[in-house]
Amino acid sequence: MYKIDVLKQYRFPTYDPRMRFCPENIVWFEMARKYKMRVIDEAVRVYYHDAVNSLMVVKNVRRSVSNYYMWLYYLNNLSRYVIYNPIFILKAYVGVSMDGFLSGKKASSILYSCDSIIKKLFVFCLMPLGYILNKINIK
């Protein structure tokens, strides 16, 4: 099977019309469920944070909407990897509320999006931290 055929099977989802981009992690993790991937730990691209139009520095609503769905995907599909990388999953629990608030979602809507009671409880407990980070990012 050719790479292009595999890529055609996994389309980039658009959960919200305000999304400017779909985080590629979502597609790559879905692909990894079916196919084995090899990773080469070598830098192939350099991102500069000091550019005026840098996507990595700007915090806007459309980016927050995309990040919200990325964090939500991590919580609902990758929580079983908490043993291997607990910091990664903790960031997702905080990030889902932070970017949820930045994109205009209510707390009840954020909690409703989690697929289990335990995940909802963790998100609820870390929601104040996400709210504080939301207020810091607005400035």
Protein language model annotation of sequence segments:
Residues F21, P86-I89:
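Acidic/histidine metal-binding catalytic segments
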Residues F21-K34, Y74-V82, D99-I117:
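Short flexible/disordered coil segments
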Residues S97-K139:
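Membrane-interface aromatic/basic loop that binds lipid-linked glycans or pyrophosphate carriers
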Residues I89-V96:
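Structural register within alpha-helical repeat arrays
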Residues M1-V58:
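Conserved nucleotide-sugar donor-binding catalytic segment
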Residues A43-D50, V57-I83, A107-S113:
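Catalytic core of nucleotide-sugar-dependent glycosyltransferases
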